[in-house]
């Protein structure tokens, strides 16, 4: 499953009452790290052998066709602007979440949930669960 969440310092206040309610208290059960320079931190993850996948409208492959069984980081942008060009450029792969009809993008929570479900499913199969 997920072992932690990394956010930019420019993100919303994680301990704002609305945020805490939205997480249903999970914010207290999941380690998180706020980073000042996300691109530098992403480079450190890559140096440590962690594969990085960015949810991106320019992704040419489906998120479903990727292997998430090894050390993995999923990059999700904000709802207004998506990922910065700098972060998207540092990801190992840009992937898409296929959508039907006129839907162009999903909010960050939904995109994150879709990825986490896929990662969990792949790892459960690998472990024979």
What is the predicted function of each stretch?
Residues 1-129:
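Post-transcriptional modification and biogenesis factors for structured RNAs
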């Amino acid at each position: 499953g997920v072992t932690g969440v990394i956010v930019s310092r420019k993100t919303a206040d994680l301990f704002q009452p609305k945020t805490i309610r939205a997480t249903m208290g999970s914010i207290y059960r999941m380690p998180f790290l706020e980073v000042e320079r996300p691109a530098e931190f992403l480079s450190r993850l890559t140096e440590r052998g962690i594969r990085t996948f960015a949810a991106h409208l320019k992704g040419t492959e489906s998120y479903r066709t990727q292997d998430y069984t090894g050390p993995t980081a999923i990059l999700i942008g904000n709802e207004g602007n998506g990922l910065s060009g700098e972060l998207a450029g540092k990801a190992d792969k840009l992937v898409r979440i296929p959508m039907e009809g006129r839907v162009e993008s999903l909010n960050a929570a939904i995109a994150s949930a879709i990825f986490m479900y896929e990662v969990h499913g792949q790892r459960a199969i690998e472990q024979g669960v």
